[in-house]
């Protein structure tokens, strides 16, 4: 899992009008919640935030978030709201996490190679683009890259065929078909 550092400051403005003015000034409203604590309203520089979000392409990432220079909180991005027309950031929700506690994460799956069954006239069907894993946040892989070059016609790859580290548990049902080569 990726790790990045970000900074923010406590937000004093609330409501629709003040939020709009913040965004016009290049500031993105945000909030941190979780761990049984009250939600903490934040504000972040929109350009810096967007640059950092693009670095890790909005995938599973542990963010070390420093608020007003205090000790950093370990958070994950729970939700990113963006304008549907301009794609500008509207709001970011962070969820505080404990790095020693297992959680569920959705991990993307990509397939590489051309199955030999496709070369022989078969048709490739991809059924899953991600799987759900449960583990400590720093033990979660960034993605699964699975080589499917050896798949012949009428063969399939299931979730059970994915090799995992011993401290990572697959939540997605083992019988689910990930990819298959059909006639």
Swiss-Prot record:
Gene Ontology BP annotations: translation
GO cellular component, one term: cytosolic large ribosomal subunit
Molecular-function GO term, any one: structural constituent of ribosome
Keywords of the record: Ribonucleoprotein, Ribosomal protein, RNA-binding, rRNA-binding
CDD domains: Ribosomal_L25_TL5_CTC (cd00495)
Family of the protein in this entry: Belongs to the bacterial ribosomal protein bL25 family. CTC subfamily.
Assembly and oligomerization: Part of the 50S ribosomal subunit; part of the 5S rRNA/L5/L18/L25 subcomplex. Contacts the 5S rRNA. Binds to the 5S rRNA independently of L5 and L18.
Biological role stated in the UniProt entry: This is one of the proteins that binds to the 5S RNA in the ribosome where it forms part of the central protuberance.
PANTHER family given in the database record: RIBOSOMAL PROTEIN L25/GLN-TRNA SYNTHETASE, ANTI-CODON-BINDING DOMAIN-CONTAINING PROTEIN, RIBOSOMAL PROTEIN L25_GLN-TRNA SYNTHETASE, ANTI-CODON-BINDING DOMAIN-CONTAINING PROTEIN
Protein name listed in UniProt: Large ribosomal subunit protein bL25
Organism of derivation: Desulfotalea psychrophila (strain LSv54 / DSM 12343)
Source taxonomy: Bacteria, Pseudomonadati, Thermodesulfobacteriota, Desulfobulbia, Desulfobulbales
């Amino acid at each position: 899992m990726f790790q990045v550092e970000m900074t923010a400051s406590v937000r004093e403005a609330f409501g629709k009008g003040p939020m709009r003015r913040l965004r016009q000034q290049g500031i993105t409203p945000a909030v941190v919640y979780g761990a049984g604590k009250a939600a903490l309203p934040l504000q972040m520089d929109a350009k810096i935030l967007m640059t950092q979000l693009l670095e890790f392409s909005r995938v599973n990432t542990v963010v070390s978030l420093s608020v007003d220079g205090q000790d950093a909180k370990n958070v994950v991005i729970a939700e990113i709201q963006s304008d549907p027309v301009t794609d500008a950031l509207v709001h970011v929700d962070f969820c505080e996490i404990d790095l020693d506690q297992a959680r569920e994460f959705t991990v993307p799956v990509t397939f590489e190679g051309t199955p030999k069954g496709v070369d022989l006239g078969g048709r490739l069907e991809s059924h899953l683009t991600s799987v759900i894993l449960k583990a400590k946040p720093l033990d979660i892989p960034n993605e699964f890259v699975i080589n499917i070059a050896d798949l012949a016609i009428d063969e399939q790859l299931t979730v059970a065929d994915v090799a995992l580290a011993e401290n990572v548990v697959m939540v997605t049902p083992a019988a689910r078909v990930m990819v298959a080569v059909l006639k």
